[in-house]
Every structure is written in C-alpha cells, then in structure tokens.
C-alpha cells in the first residue's frame, strides 16, 4: 500500500501493517488509523512480512471473533513483531490482554484510534501503552485522514457511532459507547470526496442507521440525510442496519424519490416470535415486523430485503422456532444471515435460564439455512431472462467478469458472474457498470453474458 503524502512529518523508520478482524465499522477505524500513520510519516505496508509493527484491529462481538483476534495477536507476537491491539477486544479486555499476553506493546480503544500515531511514538520509546478511554466518545469526520482502497470501488461511510439501545444479547453499547452522529454537512462532504476518488458505491453504516441524528438534531434525521446525499454524484448509495422503528414514511419516500439510493433494506430483525423478542429486550419489534415488511413491498415493489437472525436464544422453544420458519416462508427475504446465540459476559442474556443446547441450536441454524436457500434460489431465478445493471469489480481465474447488481451487497450476498467475448480487454471493464443478460441462477449467484458498458 506504501502511500506517499506530501503533507507528512519527517519519515519514520518503523514500517507498520494492519490486521483487521470484524465488521465494516471496524474496517473504517482501520482505514482511519492507516491514514493517520501515513500522514505522520510512517510507512504503512500492505504486506505484514515487511513490517516490524503490526496493529491488530480486533472484534469482540462473539466468541469466534475473539478467538480469531487472539490467534492473530499470537501469530504476530510469535514472529517477533511489535503488536498493538486496537478495537473492541482492547476496549473489552484491556487488563486481561496485557496480563495474559505480555508481549503486547500497546492497546488502543474504540474511541481512541485517532491517537494511533502518538501510541506508536510511545511504543517506539519502549513504553507499554494503554490508551483506552472508559467511555468511547470520539467519532471521526471528513477531516481525519483515511485510506480507502479505490480498487474496490466501494466505500463504507459511517454516519454515527455507538448505540443507546440495550438489546439483551449485545455487548456493543459497552464497547462503542453511546450514539454520536456526524452532521449532515460532514457526511455529505465525505461522500463528495469519495465520489471524486472514483468510488461507485457508498454504504451508510452505524449501529442503527435509522436512529441517525437523534442525538444532535433531537429526532431521527435519516430521511433528510438521504435527500442531501441523493444530490452527490455516486451511482449507488446503500443503507445497512435499518431498524423497523425508524423506517418512517419519510425514509421510505426518500428511497422512492432518489435515483441513486438503491432499494435494498438491511433489517437485523433477529427473531419473529414476541416471546423471544421480549427476552431479547426488543418487545416493540414484534408488532412492527409484519407491517413494515408489507409496507416496503407495497411502496417499493423492486425492494430487496435482507435480515439477520439469532437461533438458540435462551428460552427459544420449538414453537418459537417454528414461528420463525413460518415467518421466513411468508415474507421470503432475498438474503438471510443466521447466527447461533453467543452468551456474552456483561450482557443481560448471559445469565438467562433455559439455555438451548448447542446441538439443538446448530440444527436450527442448519434448518434456517436450508429453508432460505430454497427461497433465495427462487428469488434469483426470477431474474433469469432479464437485463440487469452490474458493477464489475474483478476478473475470475476463468476470465469472467465478477460483479454485483444492486440486490447484492458486497461481502455478505452473492455475485454476478459474466462471460464476455475473448476479443475484449477485460481490465477495461473493472470499476464500470455494464448491462448484462442473466441466463442462469443458483441460490447464491447470478450468471449471464455482458452486453455493453453503460
């Protein structure tokens, strides 16, 4: 990645690389740290083997993410790298990490990544640094340097940080702090900058995007933000983490009225049964699930719906799970992510009785996946014979174009794989939109033939 910046301080001797674990919100933190170190004169490497310092930006949302984070920390300390641990694990387990892995040179909390250059300076002087605020309060704006990989043509745009909800299963409010939104002007400014860099799609993220602005404007202001962003020359704007309570008439109208806001609704509903939702401390949601899904389908027939679900939550009975399967069959989501409940110490759900056995939880997850695969396959096959607009992102080993239509979000959904005449120079298509004829579909991906560059 070796970036060159004319407005940097004196060149540092250390070479720094990053290892990233976790969600796209964590990825934005990593990109800001990369930008800050580059500005401060550090050589930021894409190859960890070439670096003497490794910043591991960790995730602590569920047990498997923590295990992956620890594996990476130990891998790099065993290689003799100077390791700095950033992110949610640093926030969650600062004392334990320094005690159990004394090779760690520094910790950087979720609200402290803007201090990364000073942390490295102190580490290089031999200090063991613990830079973790008790309550995270910082959120980066467009003035904080950020490295964005333009080769991917997609960028995440964080509109708020933290969360004021207290879902029983979720540790995030304790790790990320209370909600703090950026101003509309700040977000639009960054979106314009990304457009100038050639980004073709921005994805708005926060813990709850539909609560955006409530802390600074006195009420949720996502609709107003979308109306302003619709004026920015970005072909696709996608919204993740929308909650049913915030999908007001104004927000849905903004989706309908804006040409570049794609009708893709990412709704982390978690469950359908009122009893389970009450145990999850989301009692308000049960009465809204049905009505909001029906409203979206009615108002925007082309809408694509994605949700994430938790199975095996304490107290989830057979009838609760059957209710969930019926819910999936009735509403036929385009995409579903399903997770087995992970008991997190410090959450209300950690001590709940009536635990579901791991075997039953795993079987329920497999059942959801099986049901959804059939639904997704039917959904995808409905596109066969149609022409679609595709953003081409890379070339396969078989010299096919790989991209996405608006109904596929990056990383979590499927791809569109396109054949093309051998006489064409394939790299000319990377980062461009093409028109394609869809000729085949399976439960995950679409396949077709390229017609022309749009």
Curated annotation (Swiss-Prot):
GO terms for biological process: tRNA modification. It comes from Prochlorococcus marinus (strain MIT 9312). It is found in: Cytoplasm. [4Fe-4S] cluster 1 binds at residues 23, 59, 88. InterPro entries: Elp3/MiaA/NifB-like_rSAM, Methylthiotransferase, Methylthiotransferase_CS, Methylthiotransferase_N, Methylthiotransferase_N_sf, NA-bd_OB-fold, Ribosomal_uS12_MeSTrfase_RimO, rSAM. Belongs to the methylthiotransferase family. RimO subfamily. GO terms for cellular component: cytosol. The lineage of its organism: Bacteria, Bacillati, Cyanobacteriota, Cyanophyceae, Synechococcales. Its EC number is 2.8.4.4. This is Ribosomal protein uS12 methylthiotransferase RimO. It comes from the Bacteria. Residues 381-452 form the TRAM domain. Binds 2 [4Fe-4S] clusters. One cluster is coordinated with 3 cysteines and an exchangeable S-adenosyl-L-methionine. Residues 149-378 form the Radical SAM core domain. It catalyses: L-aspartate(89)-[ribosomal protein uS12]-hydrogen + (sulfur carrier)-SH + AH2 + 2 S-adenosyl-L-methionine = 3-methylsulfanyl-L-aspartate(89)-[ribosomal protein uS12]-hydrogen + (sulfur carrier)-H + 5'-deoxyadenosine + L-methionine + A + S-adenosyl-L-homocysteine + 2 H(+). Transmembrane segments: none annotated. One of its GO terms (molecular function) is aspartic acid methylthiotransferase activity.
């Amino acid at each position: 990645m070796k970036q060159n910046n004319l407005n940097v301080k004196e060149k540092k001797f250390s070479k720094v690389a990053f290892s990233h674990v976790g969600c796209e919100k964590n990825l934005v933190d990593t990109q800001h740290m990369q930008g800050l170190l580059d500005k401060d004169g550090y050589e930021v490497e894409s190859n960890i083997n070439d670096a003497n310092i490794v910043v591991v930006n960790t995730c602590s949302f569920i047990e498997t993410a923590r295990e992956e984070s620890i594996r990476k920390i130990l891998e790099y300390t065993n290689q003799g790298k100077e390791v700095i641990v950033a992110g949610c694990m640093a926030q969650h387990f600062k004392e334990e990490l320094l005690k159990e892995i004394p090779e760690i040179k520094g910790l950087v909390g979720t609200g402290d990544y803007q201090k990364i250059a000073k942390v490295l300076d102190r580490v290089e002087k031999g200090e063991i640094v613990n830079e973790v605020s008790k309550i995270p309060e910082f959120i980066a704006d467009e003035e904080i340097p950020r490295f964005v990989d333009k080769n991917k043509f997609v960028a995440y745009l964080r509109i708020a940080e933290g969360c004021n909800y207290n879902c029983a299963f979720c540790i995030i409010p304790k790790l990320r702090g209370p909600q703090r939104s950026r101003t509309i002007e700040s977000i639009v400014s960054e979106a314009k900058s990304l457009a100038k860099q050639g980004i073709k799609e921005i994805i708005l993220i926060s813990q709850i995007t539909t609560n955006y602005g409530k802390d600074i404007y006195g009420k949720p202001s996502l609709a107003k933000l979308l109306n302003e962003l619709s004026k920015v020359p970005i072909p696709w704007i996608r919204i993740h983490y929308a909650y049913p309570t915030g999908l007001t008439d104004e927000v849905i109208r903004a989706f309908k009225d804006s040409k570049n806001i794609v009708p893709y609704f990412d709704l982390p509903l978690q469950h359908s049964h009122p009893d389970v939702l009450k145990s999850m401390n989301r009692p308000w949601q049960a009465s809204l699930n049905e009505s909001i899904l029906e409203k979206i389908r009615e108002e925007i027939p082309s809408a694509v719906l994605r949700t994430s679900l938790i199975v095996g939550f304490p107290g989830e009975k057979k009838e609760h799970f059957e209710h969930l399967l019926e819910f999936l069959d009735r509403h036929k989501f385009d995409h579903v992510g399903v997770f087995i409940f992970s008991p997190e110490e410090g959450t209300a759900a950690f001590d709940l009785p009536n635990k579901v056995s791991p075997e039953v939880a795993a079987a329920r997850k497999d059942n959801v996946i099986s049901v959804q695969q059939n639904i997704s396959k039917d959904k995808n096959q409905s596109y066969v014979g149609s022409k679609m607009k595709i953003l081409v992102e890379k070339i396969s080993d078989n010299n096919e174009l790989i991209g996405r239509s608006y109904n596929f979000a990056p990383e979590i959904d499927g791809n569109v794989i396109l054949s093309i005449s051998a006489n064409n120079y394939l790299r000319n298509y990377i980062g461009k939109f093409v028109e394609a004829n869809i000729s085949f579909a399976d439960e995950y991906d679409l396949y077709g033939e390229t017609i022309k560059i749009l």
